[in-house]
């Protein structure tokens, strides 16, 4: 029996995708070999590779103003690649909303970029998304769309004249996005759109001009990968194959509007369970900034019960509920592949647990 996986990433995958990958693992579409065994220069793999890029653009409704890059190194490598490629001689402005923005800020500072932290929610342990106004003439404005540890999420992105950079690793492909002022939109795909080992970057083509005439190693230059269609070196072929299956699955769900509708239903159910617990459970995030992806909460009446909650949940078939080591508590990551019935099972367990230990 499969466990219900609430892990923050790598995370649960749709069963039908796992079954299709299993079916094709040794014999891809009757060709007599695995997709993992063939060259990335073959027609067979190119169909997967370019098909995945086109489907990703279709889901977000993007035209040819954007390039889709498949890169390695995780989203963490982008913390350095972004300032390397996109910083000019001005100020690069960051909003600090958690661990991942702190890491991005640190990498930019290591590179000697003129970093300005325009606002931070660190004083309140990152429990909300601070309101912000960026400078019109900043080299770029940087935000993290969703914060996995603290359970906060931008409901709408800030409107900026400066190019907006968005780390969307933990809410990738979970909802439609207004790209009107987004210059670069990126994430690792292992939470909502595949397996670990692949990052997907949507970059507006005019931003690639910033990489020209810069002394950047070839592998770290966006232009290198754009000019070579993300085939400059051997890409993570199996991760791209899995990403392609995920794109098909998302399209078959009815696209990102339908996916967002389901995600909203799941989150509403879980937050209602927390809010109606008479203070037994308490969410970390400010209600107006609650994440649809990561629900971080505590057993407010007795935090010593939290390890027991995780243990008993696992015995009941639910894994991945232990909170991040920085924040502690309990965290349920309810990404695209989790369905409403699975979240309902968690809510029923929470009510039973409260009944036993309140």
UniProtKB/Swiss-Prot annotation:
<dbReference type="GO" id="GO:0030170">
    <property type="term" value="F:pyridoxal phosphate binding"/>
</dbReference>
<keyword id="KW-0664">Pyridoxine biosynthesis</keyword>
<feature type="binding site">
    <location>
        <position position="167"/>
    </location>
    <ligand>
        <name>pyridoxal 5'-phosphate</name>
    </ligand>
</feature>
<feature type="binding site">
    <location>
        <begin position="75"/>
        <end position="76"/>
    </location>
    <ligand>
        <name>pyridoxal 5'-phosphate</name>
    </ligand>
</feature>
<keyword id="KW-0718">Serine biosynthesis</keyword>
<dbReference type="Pfam" id="PF00266">
    <property type="entry name" value="Aminotran_5"/>
</dbReference>
<feature type="binding site">
    <location>
        <position position="41"/>
    </location>
    <ligand>
        <name>L-glutamate</name>
    </ligand>
</feature>
<comment type="subunit">
    <text>Homodimer.</text>
</comment>
<feature type="binding site">
    <location>
        <begin position="233"/>
        <end position="234"/>
    </location>
    <ligand>
        <name>pyridoxal 5'-phosphate</name>
    </ligand>
</feature>
<feature type="binding site">
    <location>
        <position position="190"/>
    </location>
    <ligand>
        <name>pyridoxal 5'-phosphate</name>
    </ligand>
</feature>
<comment type="pathway">
    <text>Amino-acid biosynthesis; L-serine biosynthesis; L-serine from 3-phospho-D-glycerate: step 2/3.</text>
</comment>
<protein>
    <recommendedName>
        <fullName>Phosphoserine aminotransferase</fullName>
        <ecNumber>2.6.1.52</ecNumber>
    </recommendedName>
</protein>
<dbReference type="GO" id="GO:0006564">
    <property type="term" value="P:L-serine biosynthetic process"/>
</dbReference>
<keyword id="KW-0663">Pyridoxal phosphate</keyword>
<feature type="binding site">
    <location>
        <position position="148"/>
    </location>
    <ligand>
        <name>pyridoxal 5'-phosphate</name>
    </ligand>
</feature>
<dbReference type="InterPro" id="IPR022278">
    <property type="entry name" value="Pser_aminoTfrase"/>
</dbReference>
<dbReference type="InterPro" id="IPR015424">
    <property type="entry name" value="PyrdxlP-dep_Trfase"/>
</dbReference>
<comment type="similarity">
    <text>Belongs to the class-V pyridoxal-phosphate-dependent aminotransferase family. SerC subfamily.</text>
</comment>
<dbReference type="InterPro" id="IPR015422">
    <property type="entry name" value="PyrdxlP-dep_Trfase_small"/>
</dbReference>
<keyword id="KW-0808">Transferase</keyword>
<feature type="modified residue" description="N6-(pyridoxal phosphate)lysine">
    <location>
        <position position="191"/>
    </location>
</feature>
<dbReference type="GO" id="GO:0008615">
    <property type="term" value="P:pyridoxine biosynthetic process"/>
</dbReference>
<dbReference type="GO" id="GO:0004648">
    <property type="term" value="F:O-phospho-L-serine:2-oxoglutarate aminotransferase activity"/>
</dbReference>
<keyword id="KW-0028">Amino-acid biosynthesis</keyword>
<comment type="function">
    <text>Catalyzes the reversible conversion of 3-phosphohydroxypyruvate to phosphoserine and of 3-hydroxy-2-oxo-4-phosphonooxybutanoate to phosphohydroxythreonine.</text>
</comment>
<dbReference type="InterPro" id="IPR000192">
    <property type="entry name" value="Aminotrans_V_dom"/>
</dbReference>
<keyword id="KW-0032">Aminotransferase</keyword>
<feature type="binding site">
    <location>
        <position position="100"/>
    </location>
    <ligand>
        <name>pyridoxal 5'-phosphate</name>
    </ligand>
</feature>
<keyword id="KW-0963">Cytoplasm</keyword>
<comment type="pathway">
    <text>Cofactor biosynthesis; pyridoxine 5'-phosphate biosynthesis; pyridoxine 5'-phosphate from D-erythrose 4-phosphate: step 3/5.</text>
</comment>
<dbReference type="InterPro" id="IPR015421">
    <property type="entry name" value="PyrdxlP-dep_Trfase_major"/>
</dbReference>
<dbReference type="GO" id="GO:0005737">
    <property type="term" value="C:cytoplasm"/>
</dbReference>
